Amino acid sequence: MEPNFWHDKWHQQLIGFHQASVNALLLTHWQQLEIKPQGQVFVPLCGKSLDMCYLAELGHNVLGCELNLSAVEQFYAENQLTVTCEPIGEHQFFDCEQVQIWQGDIFTLAPKITQDISGFYDRAALIAWPESLRQAYVKQLAKLIPQGCRGLLVTLDYPQETLQGPPFAVSPTWVETHLSEYFDITLLACRDVLDDNPRFIKKDVPWLNESAYLLKRK
């Protein structure tokens, strides 16, 4: 999946993956991570997610990474945040009081940038990758997460043959098989969200589960 795929989605505003409200599993389970309020939280492939605003409201300093420039600009504009921007290496660094975003390729993001984070939150990153790229993303995520750091992972699972992703189906078995090398994994919740997703209903997807996992870097 080439970067132009995502750039085209944002250019055409075909962003069904963007949620107009804070994720319900984030609201319910974030406190279980026991991350100090002032701790920095990393959000990979953050888009213009309102989840970042929620994390900031909890007192966290949010550090996002997003490929598409328009997504970053829309986030700050729509939330009326004053921001500065400077090019640093292969990325552009957007800075405001509580939400900083590195715009560029997450695969070239240096681990030193995230070395002081206290937590991380992945709702739309792991499920954005097809199988051919997902394992590479997991390896890069592991490089970016310091030992002992805890995070909340949110996934979707459904019969992949019924719908062309993204979002791609990520099963509990896949999570255990490919993430357990790097993380201790605890399943926090699994809920049926088919009724809330008309696109899946229209394609006759028989079931759609959203799961939340607590991850701890080994």
UniProtKB/Swiss-Prot annotation:
Check the record and name the HAMAP family matching this protein: Thiopur_methtran
Native organism is Shewanella denitrificans (strain OS217 / ATCC BAA-1090 / DSM 15013)
Gene encoding this chain? tpm
Q: Provide the protein's localization.
A: Cytoplasm
Gene3D superfamilies in alphabetical order: Vaccinia Virus protein VP39 (3.40.50.150)
Query: For this protein, what reaction is catalysed?
Result: S-adenosyl-L-methionine + a thiopurine = S-adenosyl-L-homocysteine + a thiopurine S-methylether
Q: Which GO terms describe its molecular function?
A: thiopurine S-methyltransferase activity
The superkingdom of the source organism is Bacteria
Q: List the disulfide bonds.
A: none
Task: Specify which residues bind S-adenosyl-L-methionine according to the UniProt entry for this protein.
Answer: W10, L45, E66, R123
According to UniProt, the name of this protein is Thiopurine S-methyltransferase
Q: Name one GO cellular component term.
A: cytoplasm
SUPFAM superfamilies from the UniProt entry: S-adenosyl-L-methionine-dependent methyltransferases (SSF53335)
A Gene Ontology biological process in which this protein takes part is: response to metal ion
- Which Pfam families does the entry link to? TPMT
> According to the UniProt entry, what is the EC number of this protein?
2.1.1.67
Q: List the PROSITE patterns.
A: SAM_MT_TPMT
